[in-house]
Regions:
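Conserved small/polar residues in nucleotide/adenosyl-binding loops
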Residues: 1-4
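A cross-kingdom feature marking charged/low-complexity
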Residues: 222-224
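Serine endopeptidase catalytic core focused on the charge-relay Asp
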Residues: 7-178, 182, 191-192, 200, ...
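Active-site rim segments in enzyme catalytic domains, especially the processed small/beta chain
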Residues: 185
Length: 224
């Protein structure tokens, strides 16, 4: 049970002249996305924030759970209609991977107790080059590397969620998803063996293309 105290200023009704308040309580929200990295016992994921579907504002959260979802199918993307990973989330103890502590414009962050196996060096903006790179995704049910192309590195004074323009070139992934689909946000991007960023957005009119955030941006957001 979560309790909180807030201050509300009542407004006088124009109809019956009584003081009233209006409340809108959102109990929880859920969705499927990708955990990007683990550093020690902390993690970062999504690469962008979780927003209220009705108001379009960034959700202020008390906390949350990182869970292992059940994936049923893949809906391929097409021009004008983003695809998606179709699945469900069961709130069972065995599905809990970690705890979400904060939801920011640059991703979700929290803690995770499990030790991870493979470690990557971090690639910073100056290390990134246009050309071949890879994304890590388990969209097929197994974690795999898929080839992509970094088409453009966007200047640092622009939208940090769109720091790189990327394009899926891997034939296997294109056959499976037709490009970037909802649920792949947060998928790690590797270049020259270094972790350089994460997928954030898909081009609505071209699902093969999308945007990515830099890893240095997510790490800074987690630590500050």
């Amino acid at each position: 049970c979560i309790r909180d105290r807030i201050k509300i200023k009542p407004e006088r009704s124009k109809t019956d002249h009584m003081y009233k308040i209006g409340t809108w309580i959102r109990d929880n929200t859920q969705g499927i996305g990708t955990m990007t990295y683990v550093k020690g016992t902390s993690f970062g994921g999504l690469g962008h924030g979780i927003y209220d579907m009705d108001t379009g504002t960034l959700l202020k959260i008390k906390g949350g759970l990182l869970l292992d979802p059940q994936i049923y199918s893949i809906k391929k993307g097409k021009s004008g209609t983003p695809g998606e990973i179709v699945g469900s989330i069961e709130y069972k103890e065995e599905n809990i991977l970690g705890s979400i502590k904060k939801n920011t414009e640059k991703g979700i962050y929290g803690t995770i107790p499990k030790k991870q196996q493979k470690a990557y060096k971090i690639g910073y903006r100056q290390d990134i080059k246009p050309g071949k790179a890879y994304i890590l995704s388990n969209v097929s049910g197994t974690m795999k590397q898929y080839e992509i192309q970094i088409n453009k590195i966007v200047p640092s004074d622009k939208d940090v969620l769109k720091s790189m323009e990327i394009e899926v070139t891997d034939k296997e992934l294109l056959k499976l998803t037709n490009g970037i689909i909802q649920g792949m946000s947060g998928s790690p991007i590797l270049q020259n063996g270094k972790l350089i960023g994460a997928v954030t957005h898909v081009f609505v009119n071209d699902p093969m293309k999308g945007y990515a955030i830099l890893m240095e941006t997510m790490l800074y957001e987690m630590e500050n």
